[in-house]
Amino acid sequence: MSDLSQALGFLCLILCILFALFFLGTLIYFITSRGISVISWEFLTEVPRRAMTKGGVAPAIVGALYLTVGAIGFALPLGLACAIYLCEYSPAGYIVNIIRLSINNLAGVPSVVFGLFGFAVFVKVFGFGVSILSGSLTLGIMALPGIISASQEAILAVPQSYKEASLALGATHWQTIRKVVLPTALPGILTGVILNVGRVAGETAPILFTAATFYTRGYPDSVFSEVMALPYHIYALMTEGTRPEVQTGIAYEIGRASCRERV
C-alpha cells in the first residue's frame, strides 16, 4: 500500500511539473513568435522618435537598469545588516518576534501600496520629486523584506558547529560572522537577491507614482530626473492603442532579460 501511495504521489508531482512547463512553454512561444519580428539593433539602441512610432526603447531599458541597480544598492546592504542583527545579535524576546512577523507581512503587501508610500514620503515630504531617486528608494523598500527574509534563512542554515569551531580558535563574534557565517550563507543570500531583482525590474505600480514618464528626449542626466522604464512603457503602450506587435516585442525583450537574470 505504501509503494502504491508513493507511486501515485510521484505521478501527481510529475503531472504538476509537466502542467507548469506546458504553460511556460506556451507563454514563451506566444511572446517570441509575435514579438521577435520587431526586435532589431535600432529598436534596442535608439531613442523613440516621431511620437513613439519610430526609433527604439533604449531610454526605457537604461531607465529600468538605473532603477533596479539603485533599488538593490539601497536594499542589499540594509537588508543584510538587518538579517545579521536579527540572527546574531538581537536577544530573543517578544519585540524581536514582532519585528520578524512584521517583515514577513511586509513581503506580502501589494506593490501599489509601496508606490503610494513612496509618492507620499519621497516625492512630497522629502521633495525628491518624480525621479530616479524616488523610484529607486521605493523599489528598494519593496525589496527589503524579501532580502531580509532570504538572508535570515541562509544565515540560520549555517551549522552551529562552524561557529563554535571558529570561536574555539580564538576568533571574535564579528570575525566569525565575516569569515565563516557570511561566506557559508552566500549562496542563499544571492538567491534571495536574484529573486528580488526580478521582482523589482518588473514592477509598474511603484514607479508609476514615483519615477516613470512615458517619453523623454534622451537619457536621464541625474538621479533627480524622470525616467522611462520598460514595465511602465508596456503599460503606457497597452493603454494608448499603439500597434500590438510592438507591445509584444517589448514584452519579449523583458521576458528574455528576466530569464537571463534568473539563470
Where are the predicted features?
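Generic hydrophobic transmembrane alpha-helix motif, especially the helices
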Residues: N104-G140
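Interhelical loop and adjacent transmembrane-helix boundary motif
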Residues: A51, G55, I207-S258
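Glycine/proline-centered hinge or cleavage motifs at structural transition points of membrane proteins
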Residues: P110, L169-G170, P183
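Periplasmic/extracellular loop-to-transmembrane helix junction in inner-membrane transport proteins
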Residues: M1-C12, F30-A71, A92, A236-T248
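Transmembrane-helix boundary motif in ABC transporter permease subunits
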Residues: A71-I103
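Transmembrane alpha-helices
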Residues: I72, A150-S151, H173-A211
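Short coil/turn motifs that cap or connect alpha-helices
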Residues: S161, T172-H173
